[in-house]
Amino acid sequence: MQTTGQSIDFASGHATRAIVDLGAIGGNISGIRARIGAQRRLMAVVKSDGYGHGAVQVSRAALANGADCLAVAVPEEGHELREAGIDCPILAFGLIQPGEAWKTVAARLEQTVCSSELLDALDHESAKAGVKTNVHIKVDTGMGRIGLPPEDAVEFARKVMSCHNLILRGVYSHFSCADESDKEFSLTQLGRFKRTLGALEAAGIPVPIRHMANSAGVLDLPESYFDMVRPGIMIYGLYPSSEVSHSVALSPAMSFVTRVCYVKKVSAGTAIGYGATFVTTADKTVVATMPAGYADGYPRLLSNKAEVIVKGTRVPLLGRVAMDMCMLDVTSIPDVQAGDEIALFGEGLPVEEIASLVGTINYEIVTGIGKRVPRVYV
């Protein structure tokens, strides 16, 4: 019996798990490195808790296999990495408010900038801390999100250089359509970015790191590599869409699994799940219950649509996905018992299949795996 004061690992033996293969992460990074060459920097994007895989563990695997630096969305994510002892350069992609500038400085991050107010705040906080903060100017070449108009880049860069406690480390932009087979707009964006870089050079403004390539850029647009690439989804072994090339062979790193928790036989005419949206038509239908639902990141839109794998065989989901449980028809599989493993996605059942059934992308599925699901690293 556990006694007071002892640490209890409640996650140990948890039925529903996300199994993360760090060897696959390392292999994917190595493949990206081979693709881009040794002369360019590789920034591993580990925002959203490493796309749901675990930012700290993914970061360590990436850095051990050829990544030079990391990227997060917000300073809080960078702080978590610093607390874990990760000391490499970390860029925060998100545009923070001036009142949050202290977070970037405190966590020793590099910060995306495209507003004078944020520049002033970063300069002030850096001066207070007695440090210099690296910044990367974001240029909007067609994403329509954050970033300066290209024609404002030179003036803004001059303002950065006038801030005594800031260092212009990089200038970058982001593709909006590079994961589509038609690269016309991506090439338009690339042209705008090149002209912006040319204007900065003509103005005598040095830019140490120029970067634009996301995962789709790495795969399909080598002319966008510049000084550094920023792969995200492909680190995790997933392609950004079905329209990109497979110029880098990738191994999916995550498998989402659970175990059967209950099995029973029911007669024809038995309603299954909330709303009674499924009613059995055969006698002696064997129904297995699994302890995973939409709170774990298994979308409710999979109700009456998805299949899972039990003992190597695909079986259908019966009825609605509930918050914590789902039911399966395992009649075709002999002797299914509580404790038998179930694959929700992974080998033999790609996450893209799940995403397609609910009308979304693989990114959303893996980043949506719930926080109560332990990540198990192999």
Please identify what each model-predicted range represents.
Residues 4-12, 16-20, 24-27, 40-211:
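Active-site-proximal beta-alpha core segment in soluble small-molecule metabolic enzymes
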Residues 1-22, 26, 30, 34, ...:
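Active-site anion/phosphate-binding pocket segments in diverse small-molecule metabolic enzymes
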